[in-house]
Amino acid sequence: KSRSIKRTLVIFLVVIAGLYLAACIMLYFAQRSMLYFPTSRADSFPSISIESEGEKIQVLTKISDSTDAIVLFGGNADDVSNYHGDFANTFPKKDIFLVNYRGYGGSTGTPTESALFADALAVYDHVHERYQNIT
């Protein structure tokens, strides 16, 4: 009887470990879709496209005669068009560049950490050509 209980316990633990391993594997392969889920665009605003590593990065803008600029990347699964009106009203004397991550708000490609760094440098270089002060 003791052997039967041990055997049942071992089988139970192996099944639990197998289910846990299967869940971990499923989460690993599904992590991109769980972390990066695009939201819909709030409205249409003036925009420019900046090329980065062969992808087009969509940047919403509010451009005037200012020498100061604000560059903003949205949060996780965020479309920056939601902030356009707020930033334009809050900072009327600054030009605004709201950057959509790859795969969001009209930007092409897939979001990754290395892509984010490359895109940030491409956007900064583009904005720095005209503006002295970038926030």
Describe the predicted segments one by one:
Residues 52-56:
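Glycine-centered tight beta-turn/hairpin loop motif at sheet-sheet or coil-to-beta transitions
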Residues 131-135:
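Alpha/beta-hydrolase fold nucleophile elbow
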Residues 1-49:
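N-terminal membrane-anchoring alpha-helices
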Residues 27, 41-44, 51, 65, ...:
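A generic structural signal for short, solvent-exposed coil/turn residues
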Residues 57-130:
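Membrane-embedded segments
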